[in-house]
Amino acid sequence: KGIVDKYVCFFYLRPTSRFMSEKSQINKKEEILFSAAKVLTNKGYYSSTMDDIVVESKMSKGAVYHYYSSKKDVYLAVIDMWEQRTQLLLAPAAEEESSYKGLKKLFQLLVKELKMDGSFFNCLPTLWAIARHDDDFKKSMQRVYNRFQKFVELIIIRGIENKEFVKLDPKISSLSLILNFEGIFWFSIFKSKDVDAESYIDQVSSYILNAYMLKKGD
């Protein structure tokens, strides 16, 4: 529960005209960002324009520019929204009593999201490529990566403390898992006739997590 509290907080608000107006603005911004993610995936960063995002969003140019002044602002906001959505998506994994089950669920939730909407997964390789040449993108992507690694690390630490996992380096172990998480992203780009994302991640996660498990008598 403590891990979840660090990532998710729900506020129950009584509906008001101001609240509804703010909610409408959030919905519009999300529509713009989802559209931007599609444009970024299809055209890349340097070949895409604000006009492309306007067309994809089916909003007026004024509406888009009301929230974002440039394509760089939009794409940086895409990273922020992806991080927020991922935190909410993965929160149930930290609620599992077993760290093993929690990490397995982590993989499963990512695969489920990929199947439902691969928009953000599709543009991740492009965002990493931009980060190599732009410090602002690098800082944003590094922040997302660091928080995600810490989230995984906390679940592993709990497993060690509960004597569910052997004594291992939590940072290295979390990195190992994350490198395999990234394998999911490639299923959003390259299609395989023989292996699907769900089968791949289930088998790979089992291999890794079984190596972490504390065996009886150890």
Residue ranges of model-derived segments:
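N-terminal intrinsically disordered/low-complexity leader segments
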Residues: 1-27, 216-218
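Hydrophobic alpha-helical segments that form the core
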Residues: 168-187, 200-208
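Amphipathic alpha-helical packing segments from all-alpha helical-bundle domains
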Residues: 87, 91, 116-119, 135-162, ...
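Helix-turn-helix
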Residues: 31, 38-73, 77
